[in-house]
Structures are given as C-alpha cells and as structure tokens.
C-alpha cells in the first residue's frame, strides 16, 4: 500500500513539474511584459518605435493602460491598484486552473467585438476556441525570447499551414495559381477586418476612458507582411489629440474566416472587371479617401471591400480624423457629437508590414502613372546615394537618380535658395533599388535650387541650376 501511495506521489510530482517547468520563462512572455503597447506607443528614446507619444508628449505610464487587464481576474476578484501580471490573469487558481474563452476575451477586446457582432467564422462554428490554435508554449513564452510585439516573427506560432491544420495545403488548381503562393490564405478567406475608428485621446489621457466614434467593419487593407513577405490583411488605429492626428497600420487577422466565397478575382482586380471602391477612388486622382465624415447627419462612410495600401501612402491615403466635442467625463456611448479635425495624418506608423509595391498596384488595376518613381534596374545597391542631377544646368527638365539599399519611406523635395519648398517629387514607400525621377522647371525662374532626399536615417542635399 505504501508503495502504491509513493508511486502516486511520484506521478503527481512528475506531472506537476512537467506542467510548471515550461512556464519558467513566463516573465519574458508578452502576457507578462505587456510590451506591445509600450513598443507601439512610445518615443524612440523611451523604448518605442516613435509612436503616438511623439504627438501627445504624454508618457504611457499616465494613460492607465500599461498593466492592462480585465475588470476581474480568472478567480472573479477585482484587481488591486498595484498589479503584477501573473497566472491568475488567465487561470482560475482557486479551482481547476482551467482557462475559459471568456478569460481570453476579457483582454482581447477586438476579437470580443467581432464575436459580439455575430460575424461568422468557420473555426468558431466548429467549436474552436483561442487555445485550439494558440498553444501553451506560445502563451507562456516557452522560447524565453522577450518579444516587443505579438507581430514579431516567432511571437505568434499559430498559422494556417501549421501541422495539424492545413499543412501542405495547395491551391485547388495549383497549375494555374496566378499568385504563386505570394498571398496569405487570409487575404482571400477573411471576410472583413475591424477598427475602432478615431480614438479621442483626450478622454484616455484625462479620464482613462476609451472613447472612439464607432467600430467599423466591411473593409480589408492589403499589405505585405514582413514575417513572410506575403500579401496579408491589415487594420489600423487612428487617434486625435489637441488638433493633431496619427494613425498606425499593422498586419491583423480578424477571425472572420469562411471556407469559400470570401473573395474572388473581381473582388481585388479592377482590371478583371471588378468594381472596387478604393481602386476607383485612387484611379480618379491618385488619392484613396478611406473614410468621410458626413456633416449633414453626423455619420461616417468608408470604403467597403479591399483597400490596397499604396506605395505612396503618406500622400495618397486619407481619412477624416474625428474629435469628440463633448466632455471627457461623458459616459462612453454612441454619439453624433463629433467633428472632423483633418484628413491628413501628422504621424503615420507602418509596423511589421510594408505597402504594396508599384508593380503590385498595377496588377490589381491601379493607375501607377499616378505614382511618380521609376526603377532603373533590378540591382540592389549596397548603400544609400543621391546622384547629381543631369543635365545640370538644365532647361526645362532634368533627371535625379538615387539608390536605397533597403526598403524605406522616401521623400525627395526641391527647394529654392531661401529654403522654400518648390515641389515634392517623391513621397512614398520604396523597395530597395535604384530609381530616377524627373523634375520639370518650366514654370520657374532661372536660378539655383536644391534637392534633398530623406530615406530612413539617410539625408543628402545637392544643388541644381535652372538656366533659361
């Protein structure tokens, strides 16, 4: 009998150790560090990527959202004022230690909103929960790597092609797959993404209330995800604060997956006979006005369907950024008491993805003559460079060549001798390569001008002479 009891104790200890030991790295997991918001929001000097703190100058520690948590822990107890993330966030430590779907959705509000909207999903209809795809080793940070964001490669291991899911799956007709595996499954199978439109940041700063105009769906931004360089859905978060506007874009999989029928060729390709509002908008004048505030009835309208994230997004992607006109202490509730601040962002963040290239834009029927840059060749340069324009002196036009060794947002501008901006020649995201841009001075007076390039951390200026 003693031997049996001893064996039971041994089995219990072995099981307990096996269960607990992998969690020794929990302190470096994103569920513990909550590093994602810090990385996204903070200035570079404060450990971030130059996020909204650049606009607000309000430290994230004053926002009441660093140690984000649900109203109660998994045991049903309210959180204390001083709180350290731990097991009880997800595990009912006073009973079975089981994790429920509601424990996940208490923090992951975007997914909760999608479910509450009753948007269908093939996985949920089969009884899947968060933990079906997101395994313990991912949630507990078993690899011991302190990720800055869940979008970093390795942070989230769940993917369509994982073993036990759709591993080895190929296009139903691989012999004629026009995309050659360059599209992520969700680009076609996700019905919609979701965004909380235009966060009123004064409410967050002063009263710690999360106030947005409304949650919007029906759209899918398309970007190139840096994790695998595949076309992938993206969403955004926009804010306004004291007359300034900022927006951050990143890859996102809304759990609105359907088996068939989410997206066909004409849902993305205007040149295949499709009628895509965002592409029609762009082809008219080179600008996608994604969302428009209707002053007459205080409502918002926005493009439905796919929205290509264009190469020159800083000048070609606009939306009406809104502010709340009521008191910051007002209860958060649907309201028409909003108005437009501006339609051009003061700050753009594009994280863990890149815009569609000019070539990709052309393939879906976008008028790329509205994008000003032409690549010279397919060679990848080893360093940044800005060449002397030729001819120089010139009349009336000249060519400016430059090289970028890695993808970057590029600005190329011409100034007069007093430093006044004459013309912005380039204002778009470019892949690594060698490029040239034409400058026409037909409407300018003879004289000395300057052209300057800004690409990532690279800046250079050269002189050009217009002689008529």
Positions of the model-derived regions?
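Residues in and immediately flanking transmembrane alpha helices
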Residues: 15-16, 206, 405
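Acidic, His- and aromatic-enriched active-site or binding-groove loops in soluble protein domains
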Residues: 97
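C-type cytochrome heme-c attachment and multiheme electron-transfer modules
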Residues: 20-88, 100-374, 381
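Bacterial N-terminal signal peptides
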Residues: 8-15
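Positively charged n-region of N-terminal signal peptides that target proteins for export
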Residues: 1-4, 468
């Amino acid at each position: 009998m003693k031997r049996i009891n001893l064996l039971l104790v041994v089995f219990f200890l072995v099981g307990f150790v096996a269960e607990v030991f992998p969690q020794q790295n929990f302190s470096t997991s994103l569920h513990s560090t909550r590093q994602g918001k810090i990385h996204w929001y903070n200035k570079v000097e404060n450990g971030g990527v130059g996020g909204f703190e650049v606009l607000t100058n309000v430290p994230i520690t004053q926002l009441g959202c660093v140690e984000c948590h649900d109203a109660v822990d998994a045991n049903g107890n309210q959180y204390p004022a001083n709180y350290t993330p731990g097991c009880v966030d997800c595990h009912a430590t006073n009973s079975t230690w089981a994790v429920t779907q509601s424990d996940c959705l208490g923090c992951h509000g975007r997914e909760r909103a999608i479910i509450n909207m009753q948007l269908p999903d093939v996985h949920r209809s089969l009884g899947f929960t968060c933990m079906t795809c997101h395994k313990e080793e991912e949630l507990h940070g078993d690899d011991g790597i302190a990720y800055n964001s869940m979008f970093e490669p390795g942070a989230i291991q769940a993917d369509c092609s994982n073993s036990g899911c759709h591993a080895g799956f190929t296009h139903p007709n691989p012999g004629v797959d026009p995309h050659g595996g360059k599209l992520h499954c969700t680009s076609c199978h996700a019905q919609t993404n979701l965004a909380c439109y235009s966060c009123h940041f004064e409410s967050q700063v002063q009263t710690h209330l999360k106030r947005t105009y409304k949650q919007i769906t029906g759209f899918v931004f398309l970007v190139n995800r840096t994790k695998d360089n595949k076309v992938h859905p993206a969403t955004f978060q926009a804010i306004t604060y004291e007359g300034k506007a900022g927006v951050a874009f990143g890859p996102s999989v809304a759990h609105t997956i359907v088996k068939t029928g989410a997206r066909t060729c004409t849902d993305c390709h205007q040149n295949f006979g499709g009628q895509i509002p965002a592409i029609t908008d762009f082809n008219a004048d080179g600008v996608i006005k994604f969302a428009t505030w209707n002053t007459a009835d205080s409502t918002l309208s926005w493009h439905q369907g796919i929205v290509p994230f264009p190469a020159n997004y800083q000048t070609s992607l606009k939306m009406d950024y809104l502010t709340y006109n009521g008191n910051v202490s007002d209860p958060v509730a649907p309201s028409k008491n909003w108005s437009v601040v501006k339609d051009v962002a003061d700050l753009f963040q594009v994280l863990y993805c890149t815009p569609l290239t000019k070539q990709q834009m052309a393939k879906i029927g976008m008028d790329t003559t509205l994008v000003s840059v032409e690549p010279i060749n397919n060679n990848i340069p080893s360093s940044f460079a800005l060449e002397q324009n030729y001819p120089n002196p010139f009349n009336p036009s000249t060519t400016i060549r430059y090289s970028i060794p890695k993808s970057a947002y590029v600005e190329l501008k011409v100034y007069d001798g007093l430093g006044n901006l004459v013309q912005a020649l380039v204002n778009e995201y470019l892949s690594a390569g060698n490029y040239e841009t034409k400058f026409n001075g037909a409407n300018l007076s003879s004289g000395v001008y300057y052209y300057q390039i800004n690409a990532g951390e690279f800046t250079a200026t050269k002189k050009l002479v217009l002689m008529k």
